[in-house]
Amino acid sequence: MNARIVVAGASMAGLRAAEQLRAAGWTGAITLVGDEPHMPYNRPPLSKEVLAGKAPFESLAFRPRASVSDVEWRLRRRVVSAALDERTVRLDDGSVLSYDALVVATGMRPRRLDCPGPLAGRHTVRTLDDAQGLREELTRPGARVVVVGAGFIGCEVAATAVGLGVAEVTVVDPLPLPMAGPLGELLGRALLARHEDRGVRFALGVGVAGFTGEDRVTGVMLSDGSVVPADVVVESVGSVANTEWLDGNGLDLRDGVLTDELLRVGSRPEVVAVGDVARFPNARYDGVPRRVEHWSIPTDSAKHAAKALMRHLCGEQAELTPFAPLPTFWSDQHDFRLQSFGAPVLGKDDVRVLDGDPDGDVLVGYHRDGRLVGVVALGGQAVAASAARYRTELLKQPALTV
């Protein structure tokens, strides 16, 4: 039997894993399994350009490199179980795939609100089909939109809805400020002011108790007893890792798949995890395992995991350095951009303005024990470029020990 690597998950992380395995010298078979009907595509535009009707699928689709032209694609298929001791996975059509190595790239799915009320009119944004369905509702005349969750996706959806001409857009969140969790108070206040200036309403410091309506949602009941009228609800309340198929294999599946510093899973050198499903210790920081849902992680983790797999499959003895990525993300909202490098969440207790003013374009630094651990720019292209100049400084820093 020919040697084969199975990649469970045909998203960006899965595609990059296949490409990096070829780049690292793997000449055996590669099978990618994905539950969507589409080839891998870029997800960040879903809550922005796709919702706004400015990005057809052709502009989102990744073009696989020639090196993976012989990869076997099993789309519209889902991995439902794994027997790691036997090195097999079972798909939802009953077929069983054996493997010499396994790449876990099954990603996340949106968390749903467990509240009473109708389901019709309630949406999430994770897939192309999600975004296209939501766009149809946002463009209905007179639609009133409530976004539950003031994180990155929630704020992007709210901004896009305003840009489409939706008259009533309300964002609900139990925290006192938008994006307070990852970015802290200073930028949270700046973002709140910018969104309100552009017509977004906020109900902060309250949760969702349920939904009104019979066949379709007509309002959102808040924990303080008030009701916000709504024809469309977008639930942006976090993610759940797609790891149920790995149950029964003795793995730590709390909040993703726990890996070691080389992205190997469960002391099994033939199994690695990549993308936002991987909960890994970042050697650049404090070594505490965390998932990272930023744009740069699929490619960075795929490259490192491919080297770890090839080392095992080829019997190489060369030492590999621990995975130590510098997380990078951006978020376009209205006419401004958030650009981040590093790990701001680790430095929220010591936030300093490095340049500009929170009332305008601003560059903010996040520090831990006096050391810069992340920078975030809010504003136009010039301040985003200023943030990029700090990337080199962040990359040069030694590991943070706590």
Q: What annotation goes with each model-predicted range?
A:
Residues 1-6, 62-145, 221-223, 232-236, ...:
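FAD-binding core/adjacent interface of flavoenzyme oxidoreductases
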Residues 2-3, 279-382:
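Mid-to-C-terminal Rossmann-like scaffold of FAD/NAD(P)H-dependent oxidoreductases
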Residues 2-72, 160-182:
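Beta1-alpha1 glycine-rich phosphate/pyrophosphate-binding loop at the start
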Residues 9-12, 126, 149-151:
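Glycine-rich Rossmann-fold phosphate-binding loop(s) that bind the pyrophosphate
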Residues 27, 73-90, 97, 164-261:
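A Rossmann-like FAD-binding core segment of flavoenzymes
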Residues 133-183, 187:
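Rossmann-like NAD(P)H-binding beta-loop-alpha module
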Residues 381-399:
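A short, polar/charged loop-to-alpha-helix boundary motif
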